[in-house]
Amino acid sequence: NDGMRSWKRINFPGDARDILTVGAVDANGENASFSSIGPTADGRIKPDVMAQGSPTAVIDGRGNISHDMGTSFSTPLVAGLVACLWQALPEKNAFQIIQLVKDSGSNASNPDNIYGYGIPDFWKAYHEGNAK
């Protein structure tokens, strides 16, 4: 979450190869101010995809609902959906699942270093994966 710092770039571990890096958008689908941007030091597009991370409803240890923000909220949202996708398509490997997620993104036709491949459409990813 370096987006509000002078160095706004994705860094470790989000800049690693062969992983799915998730940025955060707000309720309007706009890049959240705290969400890091790309490219990586070697010029790769990052983040890979985006999900809502601001505001996010959370439940604390006492069961109280509050709102917070961060890629720490957008990433588990995508991770859970990726797990469901992989469960539905068990014949796919990790690289194929990541590619399906990227290809289903709202920005897949023109990925950039702010939104990456955009907000993934997991229904689309499932159908694409099921057809291949």
Model features per residue range: what roles?
Residues P47, P120-D121:
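Substrate-binding/active-site groove segments that recognize
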